Regions:
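Domain-level signature for soluble enzymes in the chorismate/prephenate branch of the shikimate pathway
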Residues: 1-91
Length: 91
């Protein structure tokens, strides 16, 4: 069991690195988008989820895991992007 836990811990560390990269893209988007209304783009949310579900199916990841995880990730990223957008324009 310990080797399984170590494997999960290593994957978590890798996921954190990848999420940090994703966060950087959200921060770049906040710098580029001209209005706060541009932070949330509903069609893009659905586009991302569709692509993720296609990738999940190819990789053997259950959609019951992938979809809610990505929807929450997207919501957190949108919130972060919005905060960054506001901060950049208040300086």
């Amino acid at each position: 069991m310990e080797d399984v836990r170590e494997g999960v811990d290593e994957l978590d560390r890798e996921l954190v690195k990848l999420l940090a990269v994703r966060q950087g893209y959200m921060e770049a988007a906040a710098r580029i988008k001209p209005t706060f209304d541009d932070v949330r783009v509903p069609w893009r949310v659905e586009d991302v989820v569709t692509k993720v579900l296609q990738s999940a199916e190819k990789e053997g990841l259950s959609g019951r895991i992938a979809e809610p995880v990505w929807r929450e990730l997207i919501e957190c990223c949108i919130a972060h992007e919005g905060e960054v957008w506001k901060k950049l324009r208040s300086e």
